C-alpha cells in the first residue's frame, strides 16, 4: 500500500505540474498545481512521514488562498480568465501582483518561507527511502515545474504588454484588496509562527538542512527558466510548431478524457447495451411468447368445443331441479 501511495503521489506531482504549464485558463493552471502539491502529500504518507505530511498540509492553505484571492481580483476587474488575453498589469495592479508573488513564494521551496521547510523535509524523507535515486530527482523536478508554473502565471498576467482586456484595469474595492494584503502579511509571518510554535527548527533558517542547496537550486532553475521564457515577448504563450503536438497533448490533460471514454465508458456502454438486448430478447421475448401461446391455446380450445357438454350440463341441471321440486311437493 505504501509503495502504491508513493507511486501515485509521485506521478501526480510530476504529471500535474507538467499539465499546468500548458493551460491557458488561469483556474485550470492553478488547479493542476494544487494536484501536484497533493501528490507531494501522498508521497510523504507513503514514505511513512506522517509528520512531514502534516507540515505539507499545514503550510499549503494560506499561500494558495492568497494566490486565489489575488487572481480573483484580476478576473473580476478584467472579465477574463484566459492568460492569452491578459498582460501588462504590473503598472495597474501592483498590490495584487505583490500578493501573488508572496503566495507563490510561500508554495515554492524558497527560504525563509514555510514551503521551503516542508519540501526540505520531504526531500530528506526521499533520500532516506529505499529508492533515493528515483524519488529525490522526482521531488526536485516537480518542485522546478511548480515554480515554473507559478512564475508563468505571474508573467502572463502582470508581465508583458497590455491587451484590450487589461487596458482599463483598475484596483478593486478595498473590501477585496484589504483582506488580500492582510493575508499576504500572514503568509510572510507564517514561518515565524511555526518556529515559535516549535513546528519548524531555526537552523539558521526555517527548515535549512543537508538538502537545502539542491532544493534551492531546483527552485531557482524553475524561476529563472520560466521568467526568461515568459517575461519577454512571451513566445510560449502560443503553441510553437515544433512543440505544438506536445503542448496540445498537455493542454488536453494528456488525452485522459479520451482514454477514459475509450476504456471505462466503452465497457460500461457495452454492458448496458448487452443488458438492454437481453431484456428485450430474452425476458420480454419469453414473457411475450408465453402469453401468445396461452392466448392461442385458448382460441383453439374455443374453436374445438362442439356444444354437447353444455347440453349435458343443462340437462343435468334441469333434472336436479325437477327432482328437488318433486320432493318438495310430495312431502306431506
Residue ranges and their predicted role:
Residues 1-172, 186-187, 192:
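Hydrophobic transmembrane alpha-helices and their helix-loop junctions in integral membrane proteins
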Residues 77-88, 149-153, 156-171, 202-204, 222-250, 323-328, ...:
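Alpha-helical transmembrane segments
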Residues 100-101, 181-191, 316-326:
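Hydrophobic alpha-helical transmembrane segments of multi-pass integral membrane proteins
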Residues 110, 188-193, 228-230, 323-331:
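Alpha-helical transmembrane segments of multi-pass membrane proteins
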Residues 203-207, 236-332:
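Aromatic-capped, Gly/Pro-kinked transmembrane alpha-helices
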Amino acid at each position: 500500500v505504501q509503495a502504491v501511495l508513493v507511486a501515485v503521489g509521485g506521478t501526480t506531482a510530476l504529471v500535474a505540474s507538467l499539465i499546468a504549464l500548458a493551460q491557458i485558463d488561469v483556474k485550470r493552471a492553478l488547479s493542476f498545481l494544487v494536484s501536484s502539491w497533493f501528490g507531494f502529500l501522498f508521497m510523504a504518507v507513503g514514505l511513512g512521514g506522517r509528520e512531514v505530511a502534516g507540515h505539507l498540509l499545514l503550510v499549503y492553505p494560506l499561500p494558495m488562498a492568497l494566490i486565489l484571492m489575488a487572481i480573483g481580483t484580476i478576473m473580476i476587474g478584467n472579465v477574463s480568465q484566459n492568460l492569452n488575453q491578459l498582460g501588462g498589469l504590473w503598472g495597474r495592479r501592483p498590490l495584487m501582483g505583490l500578493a501573488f508573488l508572496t503566495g507563490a513564494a510561500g508554495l515554492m521551496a524558497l527560504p525563509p518561507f514555510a514551503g521551503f521547510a516542508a519540501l526540505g523535509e520531504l526531500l530528506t524523507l526521499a533520500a532516506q527511502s529505499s529508492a533515493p535515486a528515483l524519488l529525490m530527482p522526482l521531488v526536485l523536478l516537480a518542485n522546478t515545474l511548480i515554480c515554473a508554473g507559478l512564475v508563468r502565471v505571474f508573467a502572463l498576467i502582470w508581465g508583458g504588454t497590455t491587451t484590450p482586456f487589461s487596458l482599463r484595469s483598475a484596483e478593486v474595492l478595498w473590501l477585496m484588496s484589504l483582506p488580500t494584503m492582510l493575508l499576504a502579511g500572514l503568509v510572510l509571518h507564517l514561518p515565524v509562527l511555526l518556529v515559535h510554535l516549535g513546528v519548524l527548527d531555526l537552523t539558521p533558517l526555517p527548515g535549512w538542512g543537508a538538502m537545502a542547496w539542491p532544493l534551492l537550486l531546483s527552485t531557482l532553475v524553475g524561476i529563472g527558466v520560466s521568467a526568461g521564457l515568459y517575461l519577454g515577448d512571451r513566445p510560449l504563450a502560443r503553441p510553437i510548431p515544433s512543440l505544438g503536438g506536445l503542448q496540445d497533448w498537455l493542454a488536453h490533460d494528456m488525452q485522459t478524457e479520451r482514454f477514459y471514454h475509450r476504456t471505462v465508458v466503452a465497457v460500461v456502454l457495452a454492458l448496458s447495451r448487452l443488458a438492454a438486448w437481453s431484456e428485450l430478447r430474452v425476458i420480454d421475448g419469453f414473457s411475450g411468447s408465453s402469453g401468445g401461446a396461452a392466448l392461442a391455446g385458448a382460441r383453439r380450445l374455443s374453436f374445438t368445443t362442439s356444444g354437447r357438454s353444455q347440453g349435458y350440463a343443462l340437462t343435468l341441471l334441469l333434472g336436479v331441479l325437477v327432482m328437488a321440486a318433486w320432493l318438495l311437493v310430495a312431502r306431506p
